[in-house]
Amino acid sequence: MKKAGFLFLAVMAIVVMSLNAKDPNVLRKIVFEKCLPNYEKNQNPSPCIEVKPDAGYVVLKDINGPLQYLLMPTTHISGIESPLLLDPSTPNFFYLSWQARDFMSKKYGQPIPDYAISLTINSSKGRSQNHFHIHISCISLEARKQLDNNLKKINSRWSPLPGGLNGHKYLARRVTESELVQKSPFVMLNKEVPNAYKRMGDYGLAVVQQSDNSFVLLATQFNPLTLNRASAEEIQDHECAILH
């Protein structure tokens, strides 16, 4: 009974946090009612900083943090649970986000080292917006240290990251840049992690570069018992302490 009671309270806490969120369609409105129309009419991406209709994405400066950006599709994709992300014709949004990291350096006024950058997408239960968006921002000092300490323990198969991150369990998988270019992390998660294909919306996903120039994919799964909303954004620090 105690376990059932705790589970109920945990679920209710997550529900309350979700209900407190602001309009979940703000980003979708910005893309389809502002950025795209302004670009099509005036060749001006504002309020986005980049609009690429042919490539299928836009980039927007987020209001949170001095250097955080969001990459979003120009089609209606709600989030990580969308089957469209598994379609071969869908752009490789994670790799496009990695290429868009240069906007951080331009805003900062000098080159930002790749080890300081991270890309994340939250689960359907760990996000506040219902339009697909990848957070391009700094990695937290704690997450960077944890990944550095486990560099040699991360291999090309999904396996638990020793110690997890932010008190939550994570799976980690090493990929080369060539693999990241050729295959979407969403497809790798869906096809390679047991039963992930059944509950893609329960996962948060992140991409971070390692000191050996490989990349690590990080996946965390929604778990109400540990109050894990699978918000992979938790490994980021939008104030960018890693740069100071």
Curated annotation (Swiss-Prot):
- Gene3D superfamilies per record: HIT family - CDH-like (3.30.428.30)
Tell me the InterPro entries matching this sequence. Answer: CDP-diacylglyc_Pase (IPR003763), CDP-diacylglyc_Pase_proteobac (IPR015993), HIT-like_sf (IPR036265)
Q: What does the record list as GO biological process?
A: CDP-diacylglycerol catabolic process; phospholipid biosynthetic process
Could you tell me what reaction this enzyme catalyses?
A: a CDP-1,2-diacyl-sn-glycerol + H2O = a 1,2-diacyl-sn-glycero-3-phosphate + CMP + 2 H(+)
The GO cellular component terms are: plasma membrane
List the keywords (alphabetical): Cell inner membrane, Cell membrane, Hydrolase, Lipid biosynthesis, Lipid metabolism, Membrane, Phospholipid biosynthesis, Phospholipid metabolism, Transmembrane, Transmembrane helix
* Residues passing through the membrane, by range: 7-23
Q: Does the keyword DNA-binding apply?
A: no
Keyword Lipid metabolism (UniProt): yes
What is the top EC class of this enzyme, as a single word?
Answer: hydrolase
E.C. number(s) listed in UniProt: 3.6.1.26
Q: What are the GO MF terms of this UniProt record?
A: CDP-diacylglycerol diphosphatase activity
Q: In what way does this protein cross or attach to the membrane?
A: Single-pass membrane protein
Q: What is this protein called?
A: CDP-diacylglycerol pyrophosphatase
- Identify the gene encoding this protein: cdh
